[in-house]
Amino acid sequence: MPASFVSDPARRVEIARTILSQLPEWFGIPAATEEYITDAAREPCFVYEKDGAPVGFLCLKETGHSTVELAVMGVLKSCHRKGYGRALVDAAAAYARQMGYEFMQVKTVQMGKYEEYDRTNRFYLSCGFKEFEVFPTLWDDWNPCQIYVLSLNK
């Protein structure tokens, strides 16, 4: 089943809150998590549902005329490694291409710092993202920011 676009802003917020509240390993800073949730009302978002319930979502944010950022993504831990995350990335990339974007970027904690984020890094690499740049202190000294980029030109 493919991921689907969520047009209703209130539904996007509800989905973001439901998923992110269950992922404290990745979204453990309450103020930052709340910002992701409120931003979902204004951003293009996609959901993956299983048996009628959301198990994953992804929101995009424009960062330049040619580039869109995968601003936030979450998939319930019990649903990892089942293809739902890839379906979300594929749907978002197709949408971004249709909207005329050439690149998609994503930020995460650099590989080698935390096992949870190492899995996240490997996921993005498996989706075709390429390492672009690391900002060692963008977030703080303990969480170097790795930027990956995906070419949307096929």
Where are these regions (language model features)?
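Short amphipathic alpha-helix that is part of the acyltransferase structural core
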Residues: 1-31
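Short hydrophobic/aromatic beta-strand or adjacent loop that forms the aromatic wall/cage
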Residues: 43, 143-148
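Conserved active-site tyrosine of GNAT-family acetyltransferases
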Residues: 124, 129
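Conserved acetyl-CoA binding element of GNAT-fold acetyltransferases
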Residues: 66-77, 86, 105-107
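Conserved GNAT acetyl-CoA-binding A-motif
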Residues: 96-116
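Conserved beta-strand in the GNAT
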Residues: 47, 53-61, 67-74
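Short glycine/proline-centered loop/turn elements that form peptide/ligand docking sites
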Residues: 115-120, 134-144
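Conserved acetyl-CoA pyrophosphate-binding loop and the N-cap/start of the following alpha-helix
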Residues: 79, 83-91
